[in-house]
Design a protein with these regions (language model features):
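A broad structural signal for alpha-helix termini and local helix breaks/kinks
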Residues: 115-116, 144
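Membrane/wall-proximal cationic-aromatic binding patches
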Residues: 5-114
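Conserved beta-strand elements of the Class I
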Residues: 87-91, 121, 149
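Active-site micro-motifs of SAM-dependent methyltransferase domains
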Residues: 96-97, 127, 156
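Extracytoplasmic small-molecule ligand-binding "clamshell" domains
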Residues: 110, 117-118, 128
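Interaction-surface signature
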Residues: 1-46, 131-169
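Soluble or luminal CAZymes and related metallo-dependent hydrolases
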Residues: 103, 129-132
Length: 169
């Protein structure tokens, strides 16, 4: 996670959070990607989601994108887990996670807005490949028991993520 100053505005978009990150119990955290634990730390057990129930700083593209993570660290409203009915479970990488788009514009929100009767759960996480996505699906499927699973695959980089995951299993 890095801090940068936007050339156009000269503003440090993330500066407001630097002090927060240094606190013993921060209320805002940078996004955490599970693949960091595989590659850099060689961890055998780790969370598939990010840090739960905290405001997560997600992206910096001349504007700051943040979301409040759910109880498992995914990009969902927390109360979605309380609804017994799960119509659609989304699984995928950063596109599914909602990279650089505000929560109201991510794929989960767009599908949810299509029909207010639908309950859509997003288990996408940036930097994940097919093996990690399958593991997430396997971990949460019985808890969620969705009517449908939409597995969103991006051929540009997901094959490379799969190769990385197979090599670092």
């Amino acid at each position: 996670f890095y801090l940068s100053i936007t050339k156009e505005t000269g503003k440090d978009h993330l500066g407001e959070f630097t002090k927060e990150f240094k606190k013993e119990k921060p209320s805002k955290v940078p996004v955490v990607y599970p693949y960091h634990f595989i590659n850099e730390n060689k961890q055998k057990i780790f969370s598939f989601g990010g840090i739960s129930n905290l405001e997560t700083i997600f992206c910096h593209e001349d504007y700051l994108v943040k979301y409040k993570s759910d109880r498992f660290g995914f990009n969902n409203p927390n109360e979605i887990w309380d609804n017994k009915k799960k119509d659609i479970l989304l699984i995928g990488d950063s596109f599914t996670h909602g990279m650089c788009v505000f929560p109201e514009n991510n794929i989960r929100s767009k599908i949810q807005k299509y029909s207010s009767d639908l309950n859509v759960l997003n288990l996408g996480i940036g930097g994940s490949g097919s093996l990690m996505q399958y593991a997430i699906l396997k971990e949460y499927y019985n808890l969620v028991n969705p009517k449908k699973v939409l597995w969103i695959y991006y051929e540009e980089n997901d094959i490379h993520d799969l190769i990385f995951e197979k090599k670092n299993h």
